[in-house]
């Protein structure tokens, strides 16, 4: 009788340890995804903060390009109002396309292309886009690891019991990727911005 009770408690303790360990592993992976998403949001905000200065600089040279300015403002507002990863990815694609059209305006205005403020803003935007690409990749890697963890047996049992859901990937809109190709005749300098 005592031996059976000891075995029973040992099995219960092992099961409880496995449940707690699995739960903590899923929580850790989920928090990693949240942290990586925060980095994406930081870079999206940094880019969004650069846009008004860039728009104002371009406006000084090409006030008649009002549709492009409106498109940039609307896309920026949609990105700020995004409620989840999917909406943010879609709004980011729209903003990238609008920014591409804004930067393409510089081809028609040699004085704008030579403006040091424009060049610096363009360099800062390029650096931010690079940091954003890294943050998106890190987020997607973390989301993939989390999703794999909550789908693998036996952790899937704990994940379902505790209500953990699959995380969305930050997918770039293929149309926006085509629009974001910018051809600038003069190479820009790269600044080290921290």
Write out the residue ranges for each language-model feature.
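A helix-centric hydrophobic-segment signal that preferentially recognizes long
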Residues: 1-185
């Amino acid at each position: 009788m005592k031996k059976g009770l000891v075995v029973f408690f040992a099995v219960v303790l092992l099961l409880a340890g496995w449940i707690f360990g699995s739960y903590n592993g899923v929580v850790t992976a989920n928090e990693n995804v949240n942290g990586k998403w925060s980095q994406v949001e930081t870079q999206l905000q940094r880019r969004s903060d650069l846009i008004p200065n860039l728009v104002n600089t371009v406006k000084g040279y090409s006030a008649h390009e009002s549709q492009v300015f409106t498109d940039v403002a609307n896309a920026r507002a949609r990105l700020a109002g995004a409620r989840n990863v999917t909406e943010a990815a879609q709004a980011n694609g729209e903003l990238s396309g609008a920014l591409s059209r804004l930067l393409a305006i510089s081809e028609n205005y040699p004085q704008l292309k030579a403006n040091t403020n424009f060049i610096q803003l363009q360099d800062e935007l390029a650096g931010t886009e690079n940091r954003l690409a890294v943050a998106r990749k890190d987020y997607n890697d973390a989301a993939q690891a989390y999703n794999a963890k909550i789908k693998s047996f036996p952790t899937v049992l704990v994940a379902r019991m505790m209500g953990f859901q699959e995380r969305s990937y930050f997918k770039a809109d293929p149309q926006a990727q085509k629009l974001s190709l910018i051809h600038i005749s003069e190479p820009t300098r790269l600044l080290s911005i921290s």
